From Swiss-Prot:
GO molecular function annotation: ion channel inhibitor activity; toxin activity
Main location: secreted
Name of this protein: Omega-theraphotoxin-Hhn1c
Record-linked InterPro entries: Huwentoxin-1, Huwentoxin_CS1
UniProt keyword Secreted present: yes
Cellular component, GO annotation: extracellular region
Length: 86
């Protein structure tokens, strides 16, 4: 009888340790996801602050657009200029 109680208590203690470790792993995973979201948002902000416009970005002259793009005269957005060399 005493051994059954001991085994049951030991099993409950082991279960508590496993659940606690699982909860810690879950919290760590949540932190990683939040970090990834913050890094993506930071990259997006930096992309908006570059000095040239990407494809279909608004422009007023060819100099506003990035390499291999030109400013479309009617719609005022950057389009491919037909070149492909590096």
């Amino acid at each position: 009888m005493k051994s059954i109680v001991f085994v049951a208590l030991f099993g409950l203690a082991l279960l508590a340790v496993v659940c606690s470790a699982s909860e810690d792993a879950h919290k760590e995973l949540l932190k990683e996801v939040v970090r990834a979201m913050v890094v993506d948002k930071t990259d997006a902000v930096q992309a908006e602050e570059r000095e040239c416009r990407w494809y279909l970005g608004g422009c007023s002259q060819d100099g506003d657009c990035c390499k291999h793009l030109q400013c479309h005269s009617n719609y005022e957005w950057c389009i491919w200029d037909g070149t492909s060399s590096k």
